[in-house]
């Protein structure tokens, strides 16, 4: 491939990039049987591509001369390029290395480009690219162990017999290096002494030269002169600090002002630049006689045949006296630009050609190949070699920059090449080869137009030409450097193709305009549209490897760079050239007035392009890029290079310095190369002021600038913005004027050029300096809310367009992109698991959750349907998006499915790191006692549409019913007034997706403003909302006006689609009246009644809701602060407006008459524009804009007082809802709370009761096993725990905080079975028992705090701080380990003695006192001091010393500040020797009372409503140590539970009061109905039991509710509540489980029958009711049922069977019924008479008739049913009495008048 015999690839054989060539030739070395030279060393017959172990490797083959080194097997002196020897390959063959292999000859003289190892022994085994290795390893100028004279690139040193190799840069070498080498005894250098440039330029070496002088400068602002009294202001010393200059003076021996050394550094002949004893580039060294200069100086006595980069002996191959490019000496080695070739058979070649300058050859060989007449195997140059078959007939051979070789020469300039040549054995007559750098061979169009093209210089337009000149008219130029032809568009991999058809001379002349190739060259292709010599901002299209070739003529030593946007590897030129460019060349680019931002290979992207050896740019504001060897800046403003001066000595000619002033880094975060080509505009000099001006005696008055002072941003060329900022101008609220009248750019980056000015008012001081208020441009959309904009459909949000302007055509900038980091987001089940699910299973995925590490998670409570997602991996990061403190599902507007579908289901959201922020430090506030922390928790409870669950450790957990965007913003938290926390008017912030609408008054927001969240039944129910903001600055007692109200016609609220103007138009946009807000009337400051609210528009009853949060119940209208919605980007504050008099509610009045006129004009125009007569209904339906109609106008002018309603989804977690004295529960799951007015609202609380208690059943089962059901003295069943009950199993069955509580309870109160010695006294046993309990408590506290302690320790910065934190957590062992690891032997010795002895503590205290006494305390580390304080037993305040303001003042440190209360209590327990739990608690309580502002109160973190609820752990400790009542322990919030979850506190109260009898409720009173020896009844105890039982029953666990109710102390309450509970839950009958539970609870059968009777009464089954009452032995109740319903119904219906069955249940039980005689007995006698049971006994029958007649008169018939039955029985008895002639009985019957008259007639007749 690279030199193989007839191989394919890059130039030989067949295959990849080259055509089949019959001639042998590879890319980097031809294969010839003659000793001809190749590019990288001659080729042997068996070499392969890259590094195979062959006899003749790639770059180390055994021919004579090559670019990268050759292997010399003979004694010839052919110079190689890289100094390689035989057996070496480029990429690491097993032989000698690539760039510095040894030569096997006895006296070789081949010099490598980077230095060669020449050795005549086998001791050297060179290694490639070593900078200064031992002998045998060559790099950049390494030594060899013998007298080899090869010169490295940077100079090599050959010391005979010395194996210590010097490094490459600046070391002494015996051969001539490119940048300077010295020989022994002759000294040569590369570019120094007597060559082209041999001068010594001054370098800063201290302050001697130039001497100090005062620097004066004219101030462009004031036309005055500023004087700078500083040496660093001098131009020569501006790049140095005082210390650097002082150090240089010291190094020169000038400690006292005496000037000495004046050594200077020149461009090509300076003192050592890299620190070597010899110069890197050829300094004149004393004592040298042979000085080889860069371009051919004389070396009279130089007989060393070592060659440098540019030739033997000297740089460019000459060895004569004072010649530029080579002399006629007999130098056998090859130079870079030409070799001195004699008629001898020395076949060594130069790097770029074989011939020398002084030979009589027809072709100039400076950059071409040799044309020897005597040798048919002469060496070839790098880029144009004579083929082995060349016999000298082709005299126009191609070199580096010119003619093509006449044969099948290899390399970069031959007629056959690797990268796209398409020739077959072209004749030798064509001279079509070109050079590497595209300088062009002279191509003749008259012959061989299809001549072969070469890889790196051929005449082709293929994709892989390295500088091809296309066929055109031959236009040779001098030296053959720049001959070009007209070329078509080159291929994609053109590495330097010339594009012009004009000649390109060698040394800087330009060419004329040429066609524009699209391709670019490796070393600089000309871009399209190149205009030579004019530099009229032509924009080339491509960039090359080494820099884009510009449109002007470019050549090696100077090219004119015009505006081409391409960037090169080593630098590029950019657009916006203001003047014609001079040529930039190899040794320096001269860019005139460019604004380039492209960087080079060796520099970061910067603003200018650096040349190889220097950079010359003009009129650059600031540049950071310089050439590799220094910058030569022409007329730059404060132009500096990266290396200070050039490597060759940078000369800065004609610089125009900027004023000396302080400056700020314009781009501290780097520069985006994407915008490096954009033009920038700098504000005029006249308006730029220095940030730090020189001191003057008095400020100079300035004239007013013609332009505004303030620009939006300095248009520096290195400033890149992704989006322009919208225009700002001072305008009225409803006025819409733009600052700039020019149209917006239509291209992606053109908008970056739009100059935007700020109003000067934006920078005027304000009272609140934290916030810059900019009057936002008010557009039509702002007024009419998403109306039609510019005649287009306003589907895109105007706010979004302002935040990120984009080209509507391509949409290249998306307004909201979320970068998904695969390692941040996670799903459960994972994507891998979900991908395995069938589609049916994806339709219902249970327990689905998505989260983002460090942000939060969302857990969906219902099964979700994931089958609708094309890519499941799009769910995290695109569908479910987590940002800081924000969670959004379906963030894209309109993508949300209806409620209940997809992911729009109820879920629990956890947001992390949601602490409140401090106003001063913006750090999170983690202290629960901080007022802002408490306010923050309150705010989280009040956020609408969220159900607060918990807030702990910065994690906010809440529940939502549907999805939108939920979260917090703390940008404006400093705006909150701490003194008005009770007057907060809500926390709801809403914004349309995906744009945030953030309030400037609060840090919380939430919205359900997502499609599908609340589906609308009609398209006309979306609201056009007007927002009010009360201006607190208005006077409170203003008689003639209400408060100023800021009106925000929000343009990004939801829009409605209005169709026909029918009755739906009456459902107008909701307007919040200032007179009635939040259900309060302003006149009387009382809540509005339901009658007031009944006049609301009907739209308010159909999912219509206000964006204004309901205020607190105590909030008066005068103090209301309705949150306005302001945009996140600029948080605009519109000009305030006022409402007029009371008769004009809602009338908008501006501050001045001009704005009022503008407002009127705009409103009039907008109303007319909104209702064009030709607009059809169809257009209205298709448009999403809201149109301003007459009704809206009337609403604006006169207001609407009856639009505010009570929203149906208002939750109970409102402020003032949970008022302990006015909040009552009912047994059926309802609650009643009374507000300040007489309004009483009943709401169901089922939704607020925790439905799931995963551990509750297990814990109750354990307690049931430990409970005994017994009969009390009254004979009623009751339950009580056994005295042997322990709570340790409860801790095992529970989790989280509850488990910690039960652990502590077990430690403190469970009976212990310690194995104590029996011989101890009872007192000693008690003391030992208490110590064991203390140790258990200590271990519990340590374990509880362990996670927190280790986390804090990891965050500690020093070992002392880490030790202190570990000690506060009682992690003594880890603290000792940390002290040992930090080698703090003193602490490692003291720490194990913690709490061991009082004497130890006293000694530590004495040490602290000694430090204070001797004033050593200021020098003691803070945490070391705190450690000693703990070891001394001090846990309160670490006392300081001195007085504030003194030098030795040390401030006192509160030890327990910012500590949790449990840690503070632990310090009392751990660091006080031999202290009990009670004593530790006493000390803690005393410290808490003494330092209330320092110590944290033991308050539960979930405490709300401003009520301090003590932590249950603290209460348990206090109950153990001091005793307490159970009232404090039985508040659910104290256990961090829901306010309606009583399980933990109920179980704890039952255990402590009944099982252990350790503490009890304080309200037990003696029941007068019980004996004196009975235990008094506690009402609080029964209330707690009823509350927990109600909770269980409401959650469906009514059987467990029965178990709880058995613990009621009051007998009647116990019986009634149990039967009631049974009755409510017998609807479906009793299952097997219920029966078993009832039996286990020993529920009496009578209670169960009573419950069944109650249920039968409920369903109207009176017969079963009577039956179960009789079964329950409740005969009184059964008799009542009989009289009221059952018996009358049976009599009326004649159902004797039913009546008989009902009466049978009373057999034998009538004696105890007082009312039976005149009740049930009547129906019994009636049944007997009806059935004729007394017919056999006439006497009994008559007795019964007389008895029933009397009883019927006494029967109390109250209802119609009873009266009807009585009438029927009376008539029946009357008939029997008439039959028996019982006149006395007839007179007693309660008969109607007609019956009574008939009886009277019969009696009269009988009488």
Swiss-Prot record:
<feature type="repeat" description="GLFG 5">
    <location>
        <begin position="177"/>
        <end position="180"/>
    </location>
</feature>
<keyword id="KW-0653">Protein transport</keyword>
<dbReference type="Pfam" id="PF12110">
    <property type="entry name" value="Nup96"/>
</dbReference>
<dbReference type="InterPro" id="IPR007230">
    <property type="entry name" value="Nup98_auto-Pept-S59_dom"/>
</dbReference>
<dbReference type="GO" id="GO:0034398">
    <property type="term" value="P:telomere tethering at nuclear periphery"/>
</dbReference>
<feature type="region of interest" description="Disordered">
    <location>
        <begin position="565"/>
        <end position="685"/>
    </location>
</feature>
<protein>
    <recommendedName>
        <fullName>Nucleoporin nup189</fullName>
        <ecNumber>3.4.21.-</ecNumber>
    </recommendedName>
</protein>
<feature type="modified residue" description="Phosphoserine">
    <location>
        <position position="724"/>
    </location>
</feature>
<keyword id="KW-0509">mRNA transport</keyword>
<dbReference type="GO" id="GO:0008139">
    <property type="term" value="F:nuclear localization sequence binding"/>
</dbReference>
<feature type="compositionally biased region" description="Polar residues">
    <location>
        <begin position="93"/>
        <end position="108"/>
    </location>
</feature>
<feature type="region of interest" description="Disordered">
    <location>
        <begin position="785"/>
        <end position="814"/>
    </location>
</feature>
<feature type="repeat" description="GLFG 9">
    <location>
        <begin position="381"/>
        <end position="384"/>
    </location>
</feature>
<dbReference type="GO" id="GO:0000973">
    <property type="term" value="P:post-transcriptional tethering of RNA polymerase II gene DNA at nuclear periphery"/>
</dbReference>
<keyword id="KW-0378">Hydrolase</keyword>
<feature type="repeat" description="GLFG 16">
    <location>
        <begin position="646"/>
        <end position="649"/>
    </location>
</feature>
<feature type="compositionally biased region" description="Low complexity">
    <location>
        <begin position="62"/>
        <end position="77"/>
    </location>
</feature>
<keyword id="KW-0677">Repeat</keyword>
<feature type="modified residue" description="Phosphoserine">
    <location>
        <position position="1051"/>
    </location>
</feature>
<feature type="repeat" description="GLFG 14">
    <location>
        <begin position="611"/>
        <end position="614"/>
    </location>
</feature>
<feature type="repeat" description="GLFG 8">
    <location>
        <begin position="350"/>
        <end position="353"/>
    </location>
</feature>
<keyword id="KW-0068">Autocatalytic cleavage</keyword>
<feature type="repeat" description="GLFG 4">
    <location>
        <begin position="152"/>
        <end position="155"/>
    </location>
</feature>
<feature type="compositionally biased region" description="Polar residues">
    <location>
        <begin position="29"/>
        <end position="61"/>
    </location>
</feature>
<dbReference type="Pfam" id="PF04096">
    <property type="entry name" value="Nucleoporin2"/>
</dbReference>
<feature type="repeat" description="GLFG 13">
    <location>
        <begin position="585"/>
        <end position="588"/>
    </location>
</feature>
<feature type="compositionally biased region" description="Low complexity">
    <location>
        <begin position="653"/>
        <end position="663"/>
    </location>
</feature>
<feature type="repeat" description="GLFG 1">
    <location>
        <begin position="26"/>
        <end position="29"/>
    </location>
</feature>
<keyword id="KW-0539">Nucleus</keyword>
<dbReference type="GO" id="GO:0051028">
    <property type="term" value="P:mRNA transport"/>
</dbReference>
<feature type="repeat" description="GLFG 7">
    <location>
        <begin position="335"/>
        <end position="338"/>
    </location>
</feature>
<feature type="compositionally biased region" description="Polar residues">
    <location>
        <begin position="603"/>
        <end position="644"/>
    </location>
</feature>
<feature type="compositionally biased region" description="Polar residues">
    <location>
        <begin position="664"/>
        <end position="685"/>
    </location>
</feature>
<dbReference type="GO" id="GO:0005643">
    <property type="term" value="C:nuclear pore"/>
</dbReference>
<feature type="repeat" description="GLFG 11">
    <location>
        <begin position="435"/>
        <end position="438"/>
    </location>
</feature>
<dbReference type="GO" id="GO:0006405">
    <property type="term" value="P:RNA export from nucleus"/>
</dbReference>
<feature type="repeat" description="GLFG 3">
    <location>
        <begin position="112"/>
        <end position="115"/>
    </location>
</feature>
<feature type="compositionally biased region" description="Polar residues">
    <location>
        <begin position="565"/>
        <end position="584"/>
    </location>
</feature>
<feature type="compositionally biased region" description="Low complexity">
    <location>
        <begin position="1094"/>
        <end position="1104"/>
    </location>
</feature>
<feature type="compositionally biased region" description="Basic and acidic residues">
    <location>
        <begin position="792"/>
        <end position="802"/>
    </location>
</feature>
<feature type="repeat" description="GLFG 15">
    <location>
        <begin position="627"/>
        <end position="630"/>
    </location>
</feature>
<dbReference type="GO" id="GO:0003723">
    <property type="term" value="F:RNA binding"/>
</dbReference>
